[in-house]
Amino acid sequence: MTEAMKITLSTQPADARWGEKATYSINNDGITLHLNGADDLGLIQRAARKIDGLGIKHVQLSGEGWDADRCWAFWQGYKAPKGTRKVEWPDLDDAQRQELDNRLMIIDWVRDTINAPAEELGPSQLAQRAVDLISNVAGDRVTYRITKGEDLREQGYMGLHTVGRASERSPVLLALDYNPTGDKEAPVYACLVGKGITFDSGGYSIKQTAFMDSMKSDMGGAATVTGALAFAITRGLNKRVKLFLCCADNLISGNAFKLGDIITYRNGKKVEVMNTDAEGRLVLADGLIDASAQKPEMIIDAATLTGAAKTALGNDYHALFSFDDALAGRLLASASQENEPFWRLPLAEFHRSQLPSNFAELNNTGSAAYPAGASTAAGFLSHFVENYQQGWLHIDCSATYRKAPVEQWSAGATGLGVRTIANLLTA
């Protein structure tokens, strides 16, 4: 095994020979990262990406200045989907080491799960992986139910069944109950709902290759809320939380749903399908109906829902939508505490009416007359939240996955959002 490259921190600038903008320097003892006090965590993450790019796969974080957040920033930049990497961590106190270990276990699970090929990760596998992760941290405080295939249709989960029926891999609804109180009648504090489309071809509204090649990641919302619940549990979550994952493939076959089909939901809403590639909202609707029935204090849904959110924010921020200003402010405060990027986008009452249909109450996509695609998608979802004006947050996960590497991230999943949602749950 190769000897570890030592990585140390310094608050002094690099020697002038490295240039005035140098963020790291190399000497016989290893590599020094030169912190400037302005964006130290970002600097560490970007430097780690460069170190990995040099082919250095075994490092030792050495010397003073390392804490859990700085170690984590290094790992976020250092980790990549190909190859193996080894980090020898510095001495941390017990609380910081436990925090770091939990991030490594859970957020790496999120990244690895999102990066998994669709051939390996179908709807049933995603649901079972979620159960395994949360059971690992919660033990007997968890119960769950998995409903799949024709049972979904018989029980009225028509959005999920309609989208997923074309695949040989049956659609699945995971309903998981984390109840640390032990009281079956305990109120539900929060419900988490995740879009788990394990591959999205677009259906008959088929995607071009350039937009389909990353669609193994279309279950990023489900992975994110699963990781968030698991991480909140490790931080001492003592309230009852329910998790609903809406898992399916969106494929083409003789049995696939078609443009012009009308879906009737359990809350009485009828939706005309005018774009089979706007399938995420169709499956989330089923999960949101179940979440609303629990009468929780808050509902958080997460989904890689629209290209419009990425157009607005790139892959750098998650988009946040809510009618509840106070709750949105709490989530943004949690994001700031966890150093994760969220940005609130508009959601108003008029967005709820910008999905007109000639044949049903709602259309599943906005027309050219209503181009605010991310906002109208959120408006669509609001029709399936009983008290949508209070206690509901919608996260359009535009920062979940990167098709290509950038200066601070490798290609693939980021794991962003897990800590923010966990922070909100435990605040």
UniProtKB/Swiss-Prot annotation:
The note describing how and how many cofactors are bound reads: Binds 2 manganese ions per subunit.
- What GO MF annotations does this protein's record show? manganese ion binding; metalloaminopeptidase activity
Q: What class of enzyme is it?
A: hydrolase
Q: Which UniProt keywords apply?
A: Aminopeptidase, Cytoplasm, Hydrolase, Manganese, Metal-binding, Protease
GO cellular component, as recorded: cytoplasm
- List of catalytic residues: 207, 281
**Any GO BP annotation:** proteolysis
Instruction: Provide the binding site for Mn(2+) 2.
Output: 195, 200, 218, 279
Which reaction(s) does the protein catalyse, per the Swiss-Prot or TrEMBL entry? Release of an N-terminal amino acid, Xaa, from a peptide or arylamide. Xaa is preferably Glu or Asp but may be other amino acids, including Leu, Met, His, Cys and Gln
Asked if the keyword Phosphoprotein belongs to this entry, the reply reads no
Necessary cofactors: Mn(2+)
**Where is Mn(2+) 1 annotated to bind?**
200, 277, 279
- Where is it mostly found? cytoplasm
Per the record's keyword annotation, is Cytoplasm included, yes or no?
A: yes
> What SUPFAM superfamilies would the database entry show?
Zn-dependent exopeptidases
Which Pfam families is this protein grouped with? DUF3663, Peptidase_M17
**Cellular localization per UniProt:** Cytoplasm
InterPro entries membership:
Leucine_aapep/pepB (IPR011356), M17_PepB-like_N (IPR047620), Pept_M17_PepB (IPR008330), Peptidase_M17_C (IPR000819)
The EC number(s) attached to this protein equal: 3.4.11.23
**HAMAP family according to UniProt:** Aminopeptidase_M17 (MF_00504)
Family according to the record: Belongs to the peptidase M17 family.
State the NCBIfam families in the record: PRK05015.1
Described by its record, this protein's role is as follows: Probably plays an important role in intracellular peptide degradation.
> Could you describe the subunit structure of this protein?
Homohexamer.
What is this protein's name?
Answer: Peptidase B
**Lineage of this protein's species?**
Bacteria, Pseudomonadati, Pseudomonadota, Gammaproteobacteria, Enterobacterales
* Gene transcribed to yield this protein: pepB
